Amino acid sequence: AVIISFILGSSLGIWAAHNDKVSAFMRPINDTMQTMPSFVILIPFVMFFGIGEFTALLAIIAYAFVPAMRYTEHGLRNLPETVIEAARMIGCSQTQLLWKVKIPLAMPVIMLGLNQTIMFGLAMLVIAALVGTTGLGQLIYIGLSKADFGTGMISGVSIALIAIIFDRTTQAWRIKLEKKTQ
């Protein structure tokens, strides 16, 4: 779900960075999605698709694509204009400008978006246990419903460790990319 969220979010971010109308349309949607409690996002998916893994997948994608889109758009919109102008002067096409200049320069910011997409996905995974998913989120839910401290804590700590590992890994990638683009 995180991979799909990141691909969807970064694609929309690229589009929004190059089209002010798309950016203006998506901004209130992103603001709403980020301020809405994560549990509330499940409601329309449960109403339309029922309870199950597919519903949880869609809810995770809907919740986690927002940071990927925001960070991608932000990274692409805040590039040094001199570098973009230099690339145009040497004859880069729009496609070359995007893939060979803009995205590599914006990659450290885009990696922050990936980091946040992973964190949002993991957060929604725990909430999605309420709609019948299996895995660590379900174990937390079982631990809560049966007042089983051990099961809940082990599952919660496991998810926290997974989040920390992904966080540190994406931060290391971002730092390497920042060194390359400087």
Report each predicted region and the residues it spans.
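Transmembrane-helix boundary motif in ABC transporter permease subunits
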Residues: A1-N30
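Alpha-helical transmembrane segments of multipass membrane proteins
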Residues: V2, S10-W15, L42-P44, F48, ...
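Generic hydrophobic transmembrane alpha-helix motif, especially the helices
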Residues: A17, R27-A64
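Hydrophobic/aromatic residues within the transmembrane alpha-helices of Major Facilitator Superfamily
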Residues: M36, F48-F49, I61-F65, T72-L76, ...
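Glycine-rich helix-loop "coupling/hinge" segments at transmembrane-helix boundaries
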Residues: M47, L76, G121-I162, E178-Q182
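Transmembrane alpha-helices
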Residues: A62, Q94-A128, G150, I154, ...
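Short cytoplasmic-facing helical segments at TM-TM junctions of multi-pass membrane proteins
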Residues: A68-I110
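Transmembrane alpha-helical segments of polytopic membrane transport and secretion proteins
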Residues: R168-Q182
